[in-house]
């Protein structure tokens, strides 16, 4: 205890008008100095009117009059001189008490009556100022979280050819890495940071998978940092190596023997509960203090990292859609190509804030986990006056993960959905309108006519025409006549349906013409008579046959 002075009260920024009530409430037994000051102050308040120029009468009536004349502290007064009188009186009384009682012995504490009393200095020796705030303890923070998706866990037999874990803010143009920072560690010469893999959920047991890459061994990554030089560190070439199911127990026991258990969760007998497709990175820092003891900082967990090859946790992505627009009434058949998905754990959502609807398809419409055949849902308002663009994305039902959206446009409903008016107009053309139009001869229509298709370039098969060409036409009036005897007449009449050959073969003339032979005449004169031999018969589809000998 010490005896406070007026300067001490001013240093404490305690308002003087409020000092008297505080001193009145002080127990004299606990604080003798303040108690005596409070007693003298209350006694002197009866004579305040004397100093203010107002002397009350003596006796009990004078005491009552003095109490009536006493002005409460803090009350509003019309005369400022009268209002300052109580404050000045209090200051004078406090100064008198402080002068009389400069030092007071501190009463001995209870339980030790034989200890000598100690003298304490006056309030003038009390240091004025604020104490320095306590320093914040050292801690570790993650400045760049690892990317949740896009990383495929590799087996040991695959080697270390996979890419490293990227940062959360990585893009195609710029790549970032997971990073940490040590805070309030400038006075520590060296800090060791250990990174390991743990479960996604509480109690964050040690995961059987391990870290591989730079500064990694036994599934752990350990680096030594000097906070006074550089408190930040980025983890480059850091990958995740998965183990087989039969090696889960051995991998966990090996890490526990190395003392890797940040949350003291221990091992688990039933290792089937381990989620092999998702992990977290746990960062823990340790250092040695001045006495040589090892201090551990609180472990820090990263965001979950999902295996890319797992359909339950992989990144969803729409590759292509066969249509980009459709009627606002819905029901349009749409083909959607995507990455590998689970048919029982996927949905296709159409959204435009605040509206959202799912497409209609069943598990049988998911083909080989990579294609979905669906029907579009109707838009919230089918009475559209202009096209409305919405967003289409995939959504996993278990963890509510979503893919990037693809644009889809809802078109206004057609007034003539079945084309009745178009058909009526096509059946009854208006000739006057066509002749008086901009293209009366149909030249522009011919120009706009689509080019012939692929099948239009093929000619009909000639086998059928050749087969029917030799048959007589029942409608031909000359079909009963025999064919002409000479080739010139034969080809000139166009008897056959097929065109004549370019070069007509000339029959040999040696076998044609009259042949003179010896014979008897009718008159018996023994003269020879010429006998004409007809040409050989003509075979259709071939050249002229040689004559019979």
Swiss-Prot record:
Keywords, alphabetical: Activator, Biological rhythms, Nucleus, Transcription, Transcription regulation
Residue ranges occupied by any RHD domain in the UniProt entry: 135-412
SUPFAM superfamilies (UniProt xref): E set domains, p53-like transcription factors
Keyword Nucleus in annotation: yes
Main location: nucleus
MF-aspect GO terms: DNA-binding transcription factor activity, RNA polymerase II-specific; RNA polymerase II cis-regulatory region sequence-specific DNA binding
Tagged with keyword Nucleus: yes
Compositionally biased region (Pro residues): 105-114, 498-508
Role: NF-kappa-B is a pleiotropic transcription factor which is present in almost all cell types and is involved in many biological processed such as inflammation, immunity, differentiation, cell growth, tumorigenesis and apoptosis. NF-kappa-B is a homo- or heterodimeric complex formed by the Rel-like domain-containing proteins RELA/p65, RELB, NFKB1/p105, NFKB1/p50, REL and NFKB2/p52. The dimers bind at kappa-B sites in the DNA of their target genes and the individual dimers have distinct preferences for different kappa-B sites that they can bind with distinguishable affinity and specificity.
Protein name: Transcription factor RelB homolog
Gene giving rise to this polypeptide: RELB
